[in-house]
Amino acid sequence: DDDALLLEKGIVRWPEILEFTGRLTVTLEDGHRIDYGAQTYGAYINSETVKHAASVTADGIRRVLFIENKANYVWYISQKPAGDELVILHGGCYSPIKGRWFRLVYEGCRRQSHAAEYLHWGDVDVGGFRMFRRLKEQIVPELAPYRMDRVSLEQYRDQAMWITSEAYLKTLEDMENDLEYEVFREVIGMMRVERIRL
């Protein structure tokens, strides 16, 4: 076991910290339950706990919002999301353990008596589009983008960054013609013409 070898040499891996806020209860393999519902200012679960989680129960969640960017996540939860909303820090290219957490949460929300809406708020750039696609393909097939459209790019144009790389523009062109990214076609077209990303 790699971890045992590292421990033998005095090297310990730190657990990943996963952030969210919303009415969730985690049931561990040993039957203990952890209720996060009261932690409306932000909750945390570490990767070791996720490894030993048997299931997640959602309580009246009608909307699940994954947020890529930590600054956006902190701002969003400071606005006091509705009680029926679950907000999860996506944090970029997720690890296998974070993928397990997302899957447990998704399964818990799917077991509710009513359907929830699943949204992803990522950067309006190549990475954000790829992260959306990966989450949709691997875990949440109902996923829809949030604030990743032409209107958002126009609204926050003053915060946009210039695209100077021809290779980046070529990647956008390929995405614009790829049915896997069809939901972003309009915003990608604007990005290519104006050479900006958000």
PLM feature segments, named:
Residues D1-L89, Y94-G108, G127, R133-E137, ...:
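Nucleic-acid enzyme cleavage-core boundary/entry regions
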Residues S113-D125:
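Acidic beta-strand-to-loop metal/phosphate-binding motif
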